[in-house]
Curated annotation (Swiss-Prot):
Pathway membership, UniProt: Carbohydrate degradation; pentose phosphate pathway; D-glyceraldehyde 3-phosphate and beta-D-fructose 6-phosphate from D-ribose 5-phosphate and D-xylulose 5-phosphate (non-oxidative stage): step 2/3
Native species: Shouchella clausii (strain KSM-K16)
GO molecular function term, any single one: transaldolase activity
Known catalytic reactions: D-sedoheptulose 7-phosphate + D-glyceraldehyde 3-phosphate = D-erythrose 4-phosphate + beta-D-fructose 6-phosphate
Record's subcellular location: Cytoplasm
Protein's name in the database: Probable transaldolase
Keyword entries, A-Z: Cytoplasm, Pentose shunt, Schiff base, Transferase
SUPFAM superfamilies named among the record's database cross-references: Aldolase
Broad class of enzyme this protein falls into: transferase
Family according to the record: Belongs to the transaldolase family. Type 3B subfamily.
Gene3D superfamilies, sorted: Aldolase class I (3.20.20.70)
Organism classification: Bacteria, Bacillati, Bacillota, Bacilli, Bacillales
Main location: cytoplasm
């Protein structure tokens, strides 16, 4: 499984990159707005920091507008992936982008049919939202399994990005169930590094070391 960080904050991206595990970045209009910066300038800045995929989302709701925005975003850098919502117009835009050789990430996926349609339209990635499905009592992880099975059965090359990741269990289970990528907030990435027994082990090693050196 590959790891993307879900943020538009430069310091968070740098911190994630220092861990040596960062394969890409996903952003959305809300994350960029929170930073209070120019959208295109921030996307360009992120693309220079990270060699992998950088998802930048269009805000138009009609296919024509999405295509124009997407072309502008794709021109920023080779590693830009245009993020498109799962709608009828979104599918039209994905088809157009595929014909232009522009990578796409179809977002706000909540069902198998949505993922299948996006893949058939030519999406590079689909992003099922785990946490938001959990919020309404549905099984987001089962959706990952179902999408992975169907993509495998039909030989579809579209990759699955586990999105709306809330905790480490989402990450480990999504990996087991066939997600190619997890896009994760930095605080959850940090949670992945920890375990109570790791902390206890470090404390014991240090205590034993200090005891041995004091006695000498």
């Amino acid at each position: 499984m590959k790891f993307f960080v879900d943020t538009a904050n430069i310091n968070e991206i740098k911190e994630a990159n220092e861990l040596g595990i960062l394969d890409g970045v996903t952003t959305n209009p809300s994350l960029v707005a929170k930073e209070g910066v120019d959208f295109h300038e921030r996307i360009a800045e992120i693309a220079k920091l990270v060699p992998g995929s950088v998802s930048a989302e269009v805000i138009s709701l009609d296919a024509e507008g999405m295509i124009e925005e997407g072309k502008t975003l794709a021109a920023i850098s080779e590693n830009i992936t245009v993020k498109v919502p799962m709608t009828v117009d979104g599918l039209k835009a994905v088809k157009a982008f595929a014909e232009l050789g522009i990578k796409t990430n179809v977002t706000l996926i909540f069902s198998v049919p949505q993922a299948l349609l996006a893949a058939r339209a030519g999406a590079t990635y689909v992003s099922p939202f785990l946490g938001r499905l959990d919020d309404i009592g549905h099984d987001g992880l089962q959706l990952i399994s179902d999408i992975a099975d169907i993509f495998s059965t039909h030989g579809l090359p579209t990759q699955i990005i586990a999105a709306s990741v809330r905790h480490p269990v989402h990450v480990s289970e999504a990996a087991k169930r066939g997600a190619h990528i997890a896009t994760i907030p930095l605080n959850v990435i940090k949670q992945l590094t920890g375990h109570p027994l790791t902390d206890k082990g470090i404390e014991k090693f240090l205590a034993d070391w200090n005891k041995e050196n004091v006695e000498k």
